């Protein structure tokens, strides 16, 4: 058998770990020396089955973390939660007969299966052991014995296969057993279940570079490091040039608007020395309404200058107390347990001083952990639950608390989490068709794809990312957890990470947003294609509800709101999207992010920095679109002075010399076919003029001089419109309302581009570049158009 060597990366909490894997041996890197939230590692391959062997009685001491430099990988039991023995095969038609191990193991544990009972929200349910939980999972997926036909299918399985259009005689034994395990309904409470089909649609939208969702191009030459990020480091105490990434403004907890704090705007940011295990939070400030990126200043590390990698502070949110102090909500991370990331939601009161030039941190008090066990165990996975089955691949999350206050003055935290026993991770989730969301044909095809790919199967077994919500009680400076609720969003079987949630109220609706990397999902085909075509797989997802604590539905049908536009190692790559309300608007949001992935992936000295912000519009029908409005870097408050063209780019200007080489250094992807896109223009939600059905003359003109004109009957809502087709290959598609009169506004479309390395530079046709060539061409076009109107009787 040929030995193959490839580099793989996996994410442990917010830490990326690089490993070289062969068919027999893995060499790891100590977790204490790697960094959080490293995005150029987008190629994450689930090494669940390859990294280590799960013992039948796994304990809380993770030997995988302890011995990852010397672990011998054995091709025996999978490391998914139910210790499945499903073998990897290249074809679904291959007959597999070794499921006896699963059935035997399940039968042994059937009598020990534990019944999961709901616990009180204030009392973490950690009493149920993982052995019992595992036994329950295995019992749930045991193949039923009441097969009824010659193919070994149950009545339900036969119906599913028939609806899917499958030739029953072609089914393998493995596929028959899988179909017999399928559940069509689930009693588990999930909030909105992010389905496999939704994930698929999100990836396809990213690949298509739909301009409604594709992040605008930025001018790479205009991007600079943040001056305020050259500051005293929290760990070393020395002045250093720091990366700045996840950031959040001090906001009104009810409206979400950036607070004017004594004439200043305040922002809390994660910062650290590149290529160092240095993850702490700092307070940044600028005059309120000042759009100059260079005017931002640094008040320093919020928790002082004796910080260590053992105790870190990750993302959160902040608001202002009645006495003017800040109430900070953040993630306190303890890495002392074999370098694992024990994440807990925490809060602290930050007392500030100021004058007309500066803001100072005077003291920090009331620093307390709100969730000492991590999750409560029932709604959300606790640290102990995760630790007892962790073998080096499963992601744990209890982080990024976002504070929001309702009309009654009650405060809630929305946060990233992992599902608890209410809807736990496990192999049985693969056979739960409520997780798929498609037709029988789609669901069965996807199920069989899992059977074909051990990596995907394992990812699906572990995946249990969620967006959670809890209610606070008590004094606002020293709050306590009052109640945990069922997740607002769950993604069992689909994704293992949904980051940085925030909720914004627009009008009478609540909008939930979260950032994610698709490579933390189980659909390897989808995110690998995104990497191949675009070079990155980051997205922002959005959901809407009439209530804060439940009822969320995906925006744009799938949940997609923003998609990556450029490769992960370009200077203008972005992530960690955070939506900020625009004062006085009920349908626009300012989208903020950091730019340039951490640890100098875009080149030496090109640190992570704040990106230019841009607008999106939220429409009444539950759709959104990116608008052609952009700011300078680090603008958190949109007003008329925010608008600039300095940072606006095209695909030609979105990269620095040497970046557009068709290669991303994660060792698996080479080449990508980027597509141009143009953000939309702002449109009021209430039309200013009535919609009429008029005679429209449409015509297409190509640059080689061909003209095609034909009158058609369409619905038109303005004096004229220009349609740009991504597939037009340089043609103009113009529709003109004859009755309205006026001038024709003609804009060349974006030309299609070649996917090869030599020609994948943007063929972005700008008015400037084509103006000289276009003036005489468009004059001739107008003359032809006028003659045509007269010839058919229009005046």
Curated annotation (Swiss-Prot):
Positions annotated to bind sucrose: 245-246, 315, 399-400, 497, 517
Single GO BP term: carbohydrate utilization
Annotated stretches, region: Disordered: 42-83, 103-138
InterPro entries associated with the record: Glyco_hydro_68, Glyco_hydro_beta-prop_sf, KxYKxGKxW
Cytoplasm listed as a keyword: no
Family: Belongs to the glycosyl hydrolase 68 family.
Official protein name in the record: Levansucrase
Lineage: Bacteria, Bacillati, Bacillota, Bacilli, Lactobacillales
Gene: ftf
């Amino acid at each position: 058998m040929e030995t193959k060597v490839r580099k793989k990366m996996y994410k442990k909490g917010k830490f990326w770990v690089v490993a070289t894997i062969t068919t027999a041996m893995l060499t790891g890197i100590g977790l204490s020396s790697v960094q959080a939230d490293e995005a150029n590692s987008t190629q994450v391959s689930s090494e669940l089955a390859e990294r280590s062997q799960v013992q039948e009685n796994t304990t809380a001491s993770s030997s995988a973390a302890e011995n990852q430099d010397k672990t011998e990988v054995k091709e025996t039991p999978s490391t998914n939660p139910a210790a499945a023995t499903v073998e990897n095969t290249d074809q679904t038609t291959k007959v597999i007969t070794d499921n006896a191990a699963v059935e035997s193991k399940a039968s042994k544990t059937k009598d020990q299966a534990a019944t999961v009972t709901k616990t009180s929200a204030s009392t973490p349910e950690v009493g149920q052991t993982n052995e019992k939980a595992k036994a329950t999972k295995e019992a749930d997926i045991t193949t039923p014995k009441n097969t009824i036909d010659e193919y070994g299918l149950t009545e339900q399985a036969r119906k599913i296969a028939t609806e899917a259009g499958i030739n029953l005689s072609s089914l393998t034994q493995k596929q028959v057993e899988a179909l017999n395990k399928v559940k069509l309904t689930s009693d588990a409470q999930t909030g909105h279940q992010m389905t496999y089909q939704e994930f698929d649609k999100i990836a396809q939208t990213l690949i298509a570079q739909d301009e409604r969702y594709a992040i605008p191009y930025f001018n790479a030459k205009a991007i600079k490091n943040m001056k305020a990020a050259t500051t005293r480091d929290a760990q070393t105490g020395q002045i250093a040039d720091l990366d700045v990434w996840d950031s959040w403004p001090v906001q009104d907890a009810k409206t979400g608007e950036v607070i004017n704090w004594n004439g200043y705007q305040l922002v809390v940011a994660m910062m650290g020395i590149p290529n160092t295990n240095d993850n702490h939070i700092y307070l940044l400030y600028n005059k309120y309404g000042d759009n100059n990126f260079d005017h931002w200043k640094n008040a320093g590390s919020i928790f002082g200058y004796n910080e260590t990698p053992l105790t870190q502070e990750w993302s959160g949110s902040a608001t202002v107390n009645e006495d003017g102090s800040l109430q900070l909500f953040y993630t306190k991370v303890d890495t002392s347990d074999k370098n694992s990331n024990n994440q807990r939601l925490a809060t602290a009161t930050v007392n500030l001083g100021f004058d007309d030039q500066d803001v100072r941190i005077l003291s920090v008090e009331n620093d307390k952990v709100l969730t000492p066990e991590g999750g409560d165990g029932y709604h959300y996975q606790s640290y102990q639950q995760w630790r007892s089955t962790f073998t080096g691949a499963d992601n744990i999350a209890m982080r990024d608390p976002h504070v929001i206050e309702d009309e009654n003055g009650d405060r809630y935290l929305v946060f990233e989490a992992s599902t608890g026993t209410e809807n736990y991770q496990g192999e049985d989730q693969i056979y739960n068709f409520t997780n798929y969301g498609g037709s029988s044909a789609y669901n069965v095809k996807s199920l069989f794809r899992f059977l074909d790919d051990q990596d995907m199967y394992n990812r699906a077994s572990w995946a249990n990312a969620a967006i959670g919500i809890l209610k606070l009680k008590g004094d606002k400076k020293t709050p306590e957890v009052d109640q945990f609720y069922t997740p607002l969003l769950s993604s069992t079987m689909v994704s293992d990470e949904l980051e940085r949630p925030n909720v914004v109220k627009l009008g009478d609706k609540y909008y939930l947003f979260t950032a994610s990397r698709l490579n933390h999902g189980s659909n390897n085909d989808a995110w690998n294609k995104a990497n191949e075509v675009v070079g990155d797989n980051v997205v922002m997802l959005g959901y809407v509800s009439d209530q804060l604590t439940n009822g969320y539905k995906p925006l744009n049908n799938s949940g997609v709101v923003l998609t990556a536009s450029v490769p992960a190692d370009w200077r203008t790559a972005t992530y960690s999207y955070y939506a900020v309300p625009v004062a006085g608007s009920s349908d626009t949001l300012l989208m903020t992010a950091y730019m340039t992935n951490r640890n100098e992936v875009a080149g030496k000295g090109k640190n992570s920095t704040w990106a230019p912000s841009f607008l999106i519009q939220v429409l009444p029908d539950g759709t959104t679109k990116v608008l052609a409005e952009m700011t300078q870097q680090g603008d958190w408050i949109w007003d008329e002075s925010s608008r600039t063209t300095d940072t606006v780019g095209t695909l030609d200007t979105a990269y620095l010399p040497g970046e557009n080489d068709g290669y991303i250094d994660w060792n698996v992807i080479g080449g990508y076919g980027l597509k141009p896109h143009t953000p939309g223009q702002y449109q009021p939600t209430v039309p200013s003029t009535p919609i009429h059905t008029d005679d429209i003359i449409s015509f297409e003109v190509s640059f080689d001089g061909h003209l095609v004109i034909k009158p058609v009957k369409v619905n038109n809502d303005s004096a004229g419109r220009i349609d740009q087709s991504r597939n037009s290959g340089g043609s103009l598609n113009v529709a003109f309302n004859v009755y309205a009169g006026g001038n024709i506004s003609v804009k060349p479309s974006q030309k299609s581009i070649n996917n090869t390395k030599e020609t994948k530079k943007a063929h972005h046709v700008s008015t400037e570049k084509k103006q000289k060539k276009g003036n005489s061409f468009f004059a001739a076009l107008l003359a032809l158009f006028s003659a045509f109107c007269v010839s058919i009787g229009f005046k």
